[in-house]
């Protein structure tokens, strides 16, 4: 099992380039199911979740060529000959975003069979909002043997109001509505940049969508969509992780190929902590000198403080002078990294959805265990400032969403090495069709 060995104490210095957003690439790949024509996606990150999505689409009969190593990380998908409209449990259990194929499949082929995702390390992410929305669009939904089965001759436009904000639910039903008969109005939609990026791709494919970037989307269905070429937005969570790495280690970093407008809540919070931030076009410079001030962070849907940055911010809070309070409002059970940070010397008390972090505490290297993607990132950050050597086990979690993170950190001066093989041959990201 892969591990990271990190020796802390080195300020990070230099430039780092952010990869494409995994959470934008996954729905974009699913959107290729909506057309018989090729869809070309650029800036696709080389991470495990993309490999899983490729395997899922190929199992349905799609041709997928992951062009890593080529210009712009260009990926081509062609779903002309779909032979098996099913997402198996073996694939869905490793990546819950696999359920994003439900809407596109039933919209284009009239049927879909998608495994229920089961449990999740960071709490419930129910698929019921997807199901209720598809039923509103006229799909007949049944559940059998752990699978959701959807059928429809052609979906019909309707008025959908989400009971709670859901990113994947918004994306799934948005894709389905593009091929529905008539007009669909969706209210209380997620406004994350990744949702907006998907909408822009769909418009390039011929979809008619109004209200992009707002909480109300109006979709006028069309008979068919065509191929398109699209560049995936930069990964705001990777950018935020490196920005915190610079602040935490007392470094001076230029985080390049990012969109500062997607980072507003995080950058504002870090400035409260005393971190110097300079945004310029597609880059953010982070400088940290002297004492970090404590601060409180409460996760919210976009444009609020992102839940996917909560664990990383907690690592920063351990090095702030005073008490910080971190509140997790999106998911339950998303403080699993806290006990591992405590093993390294952090002073953290959990009270329900609140974590009280008292700093500044010296951290020391220890053997720790990663429980999920963002928890992995928080442990890497803590290890960068810990005295001595930290061994992080189960780093396959971090490989799901960060492209070659150890290489990028080494390029900034960090002492980090991997034990194990990043992409075993059976999971090779090399171009396959």
From Swiss-Prot:
Phosphoenolpyruvate binds at residues 22-23. It catalyses: phosphoenolpyruvate + UDP-N-acetyl-alpha-D-glucosamine = UDP-N-acetyl-3-O-(1-carboxyvinyl)-alpha-D-glucosamine + phosphate. It comes from the Bacteria. Keywords: Cell cycle, Cell division, Cell shape, Cell wall biogenesis/degradation, Cytoplasm, Peptidoglycan synthesis, Pyruvate, Transferase. GO terms for molecular function: UDP-N-acetylglucosamine 1-carboxyvinyltransferase activity. One of its GO terms (cellular component) is cytoplasm. InterPro entries: Enolpyruvate_Tfrase_dom (IPR001986), Enolpyruvate_Tfrase_sf (IPR036968), MurA_subfamily (IPR050068), RNA3'P_cycl/enolpyr_Trfase_a/b (IPR013792), UDP_GlcNAc_COvinyl_MurA (IPR005750). The active site is at residue 120. Its EC number is 2.5.1.7. UDP-N-acetyl-alpha-D-glucosamine binds at residues 96, 125-129, 308, 330. GO terms for biological process: cell division; cell wall organization; peptidoglycan biosynthetic process; regulation of cell shape; UDP-N-acetylgalactosamine biosynthetic process. The modification 2-(S-cysteinyl)pyruvic acid O-phosphothioketal is found at residue 120. It is found in: Cytoplasm. It holds the Pfam family EPSP_synthase. Its main location: cytoplasm. Pathway: Cell wall biogenesis; peptidoglycan biosynthesis. Cell wall formation. Adds enolpyruvyl to UDP-N-acetylglucosamine. NCBIfam families: murA, PRK09369.1. Belongs to the EPSP synthase family. MurA subfamily. This is UDP-N-acetylglucosamine 1-carboxyvinyltransferase.
């Amino acid at each position: 099992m892969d591990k990271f060995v990190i020796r802390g104490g080195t300020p990070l210095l230099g430039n780092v380039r952010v990869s494409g957003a995994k959470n934008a690439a996954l729905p974009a790949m699913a959107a290729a199911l909506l057309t018989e024509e090729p869809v070309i996606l650029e800036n696709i990150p080389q991470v495990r979740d993309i490999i899983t999505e490729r395997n899922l689409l190929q199992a349905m009969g799609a041709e997928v060529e992951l062009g890593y190593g080529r210009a712009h990380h260009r990926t081509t998908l062609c779903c002309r000959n779909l032979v098996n409209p099913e997402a198996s449990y073996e694939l869905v259990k490793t990546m819950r975003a696999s359920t994003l194929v439900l809407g596109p499949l039933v919209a284009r082929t009239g049927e879909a069979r998608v495994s229920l995702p089961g449990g999740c390390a960071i709490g419930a992410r129910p698929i019921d909002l997807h199901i209720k929305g598809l039923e509103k669009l006229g799909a007949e939904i049944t559940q059998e043997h752990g699978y959701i089965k959807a059928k429809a001759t052609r979906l019909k436009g309707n008025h959908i109001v989400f009971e709670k904000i859901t990113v994947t639910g918004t994306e799934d039903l948005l894709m389905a509505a593009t091929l529905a008969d008539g007009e669909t109005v969706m209210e209380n939609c997620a406004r994350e940049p990744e949702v907006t990026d998907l909408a822009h791709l769909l418009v390039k494919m011929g979809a008619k969508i109004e209200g992009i970037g707002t909480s109300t989307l109006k979709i006028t269905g069309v008979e068919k969509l065509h191929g398109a070429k699209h560049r995936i937005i930069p990964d705001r969570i990777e950018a935020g992780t490196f920005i915190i790495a610079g602040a935490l280690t007392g470094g001076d970093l230029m985080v390049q190929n990012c969109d500062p407008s997607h980072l507003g809540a995080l950058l504002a919070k870090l400035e409260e902590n005393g971190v110097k931030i300079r945004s310029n076009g597609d880059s953010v410079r982070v400088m940290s000198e002297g004492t970090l001030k404590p601060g409180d962070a409460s996760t919210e849907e976009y444009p609020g403080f992102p839940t996917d940055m909560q664990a990383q911010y907690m690592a920063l809070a351990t090095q702030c002078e005073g008490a910080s309070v971190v509140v997790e409002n999106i998911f339950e059970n998303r403080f699993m990294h806290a006990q591992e940070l405590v093993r390294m010397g952090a002073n953290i008390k959990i009270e329900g959805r609140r974590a009280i972090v008292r700093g500044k505490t010296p951290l020391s290297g220890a053997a720790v265990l990663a429980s999920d993607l963002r928890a992995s990132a928080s442990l890497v950050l803590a290890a960068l400032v810990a005295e001595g050597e930290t061994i992080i086990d189960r780093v396959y979690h971090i490989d799901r969403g960060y492209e070659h993170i150890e290489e990028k950190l080494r390029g900034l001066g960090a002492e980090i090495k991997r034990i194990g093989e990043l992409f075993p041959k059976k999971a090779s990201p090399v171009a396959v069709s």
